[in-house]
């Protein structure tokens, strides 16, 4: 009888421990969603919270390319489509609801400039050709923009190969961004850290 009682007590303790662990895991899962590529998903609210702690850098791939689509071009064939422009405008509106204070940059291609224009809804932005060159030097270029922006949040319209490079270099994951997908980084003590993939909403 004593042995049965001890086993029963141990089982109750085990079940209590297991239940507690499951509660913790459930809590973590509800707070941190993950993309299929292994990057944490960061929505607007999480981005706003991060921006209160450090300057954030959000790097967007440009909107839908005209020369790779059957959809109507906005204007120049090397730019974006009408659908892409509308998507960029909707994205900019949603983004600005959570992050109002940021400086905007674009690489020097028609598609990124048009994407930034429609995203900004009239906000001025700076064209920087270095945002086209994506390799180990991209971090120095981003830090230069942060200094110019006096460590404000910055948004950059760039290209898929830039986002792919950063995801692989910083977290060792394969990231194949679609149009207007984005990565979130933050600056701390002069270093850049990749936090995850921006997911509007």
Curated annotation (Swiss-Prot):
Family membership noted in the UniProt record: Belongs to the phosphoglycerate mutase family. Ais subfamily.
Taxonomic source organism: Salmonella paratyphi A (strain AKU_12601)
GO cellular component, one term: periplasmic space
Enzyme Commission identifier(s): 3.1.3.-
Pathway the protein contributes to: Bacterial outer membrane biogenesis; lipopolysaccharide metabolism
Location(s) in or outside the cell: Periplasm
One record GO biological process: lipopolysaccharide metabolic process
The keyword Signal is assigned to this record: yes
Stored HAMAP family: Ais (MF_01868)
Gene name of this polypeptide: ais
GO MF annotation: an example: phosphatase activity
UniProt main location, coarse: periplasm
Keywords: Hydrolase, Periplasm, Signal
Protein name listed in UniProt: Lipopolysaccharide core heptose(II)-phosphate phosphatase
Signal peptide from the UniProt entry: 1-35
Annotated InterPro entries: His_PPase_superfam, LipoPS_heptP_Pase
Stated role: Catalyzes the dephosphorylation of heptose(II) of the outer membrane lipopolysaccharide core.
């Amino acid at each position: 009888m004593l042995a049965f009682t001890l086993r029963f007590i141990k089982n109750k303790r085990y079940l209590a421990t297991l239940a507690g662990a499951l509660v913790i895991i459930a809590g973590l899962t509800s707070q941190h969603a993950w993309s299929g590529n292994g990057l944490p998903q960061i929505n607007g609210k999480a981005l706003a919270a991060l921006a209160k702690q450090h300057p954030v850098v959000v790097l967007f791939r440009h909107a839908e390319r005209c020369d790779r689509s059957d959809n109507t071009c906005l204007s120049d064939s090397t730019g974006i489509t009408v659908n892409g422009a509308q998507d960029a405008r909707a994205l900019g509106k949603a983004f600005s609801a959570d992050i109002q204070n940021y400086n905007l940059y674009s690489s020097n291609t028609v598609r990124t400039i048009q994407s930034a224009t429609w995203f900004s809804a009239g906000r001025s932005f700076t064209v920087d050709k270095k945002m086209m060159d994506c390799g180990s030097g991209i971090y120095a270029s981003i830090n230069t923009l942060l200094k110019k922006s006096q460590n404000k949040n910055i948004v950059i319209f760039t290209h898929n190969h830039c986002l792919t490079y950063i995801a692989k270099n910083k977290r060792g994951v394969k990231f194949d961004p679609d149009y207007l997908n984005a990565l979130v980084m933050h600056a701390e003590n002069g270093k850049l850290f990749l936090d995850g993939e921006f997911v509007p909403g």
